[in-house]
Regions:
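Residue-identity detector for glutamine
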Residues: 18, 34, 89, 116-117
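Charged/polar, solvent-exposed surface patches and flexible loops
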Residues: 26, 30, 72, 82, ...
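Acidic/histidine-rich alpha-helical segments that form the ligand environment
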Residues: 43-106
Length: 123
C-alpha cells in the first residue's frame, strides 16, 4: 500500500533527489558563478509550473500515484536528454558535469523502472 511505498520507494527517491539537487547546485554555481540561477523562489516557481501538467495525487490509489510518478519521471528523463544536448552544443558540458548529469540520468531511469513495476496492477 501507500504507506509502504512512501517509506521504501518514495522515501528513497526523495532522499536521493535532495542529494542530487545539492550536487547540481554546487556545480552550477562553480561553473557559472551566477547565484540567481539557484534562487529558491525562482526554482519553486518553475517546479510548480511543471507540476501543473500532472494530476494531484490526493485521493488517488497507490497504483495511480505510482503511474503518475512514472509519467513525471519519464518526462523528466526526456527533458534531461534535451538539456544535456543543449549544454553540449553550447560547449558548456565539462567532463565533470557530463559525468554528474549521466549518473543522475541513470538514477532517474532506475526510478522509472521501479515506479513502472510498482504501477503494475495485480491480475
Amino acid at each position: 500500500g501507500f504507506s509502504g511505498d512512501h517509506v521504501n520507494l518514495y522515501g528513497m527517491i526523495y532522499t536521493e533527489l535532495q542529494e542530487e539537487f545539492d550536487a547540481v547546485a554546487e556545480r552550477v554555481l562553480g561553473l557559472t558563478n551566477q547565484e540567481e540561477l539557484l534562487c529558491p523562489k525562482h526554482i519553486i516557481s518553475m517546479a510548480l509550473e511543471l507540476l501543473k501538467k500532472y494530476p494531484s495525487p490526493v485521493n488517488m490509489s497507490d497504483i495511480d500515484i505510482a503511474l503518475t510518478a512514472h509519467k513525471v519521471i519519464l518526462d523528466y528523463c526526456l527533458w534531461e536528454n534535451n538539456f544535456h544536448m543543449h549544454l553540449d552544443q553550447a560547449n558548456m558540458l565539462t567532463i565533470g558535469l557530463d559525468d554528474l548529469l549521466s549518473a543522475n540520468a541513470s538514477n532517474h531511469e532506475r526510478y522509472a523502472y521501479l515506479l513502472q513495476q510498482r504501477g503494475k496492477r495485480s491480475v
